Amino acid sequence: APPPVGDQAGGRKVDCFKYNTTGSEFACSRKWQPVCGTDHRTYSNECMFCMLTQNKRFPVRILQDNKCDIECPQYSDMCTMDYLPLCGSDGKNYSNKCLFCNAVLRSRGALFLAKHGQCQSP
């Protein structure tokens, strides 16, 4: 996976004022130029990212200029025991996507995918 663009820990901040021309409504195009937010959701373009994240309880930044490697649509109370390990940016191994996504959501976007598979052991 390509490294995230911008500050490793927090992603890239976007100046959303350039898309919010009227003060209350965004004028977004349908152009497909995907970006991945620190909430691990893919947005169709930077303008849509701004429109859909403006009212989040915590600030969302752009993790990378492309689709997300792992999509984390929502928190899950129950995770399966499937073993498909993912290595988090915190150096911890997560047994599967569900456990990784729950950690991402708890971290409020601070955690991102370092790589598929286990982290290197010391």
Swiss-Prot record:
It comes from the Eukaryota. The keyword Ligase does not apply. GO terms for cellular component: extracellular region. Residues 10-70, 71-121 form the Kazal-like domain. InterPro entries: Bifunctional_prot_inhibitor, Kazal_dom, Kazal_dom_sf, Prot_inh_Kazal-m. Pfam families: Kazal_1. This inhibitor is composed of two homologous actively inhibiting halves: one which inhibits trypsin, the other which inhibits elastase. This is Double-headed protease inhibitor, submandibular gland. It comes from Mustela lutreola.
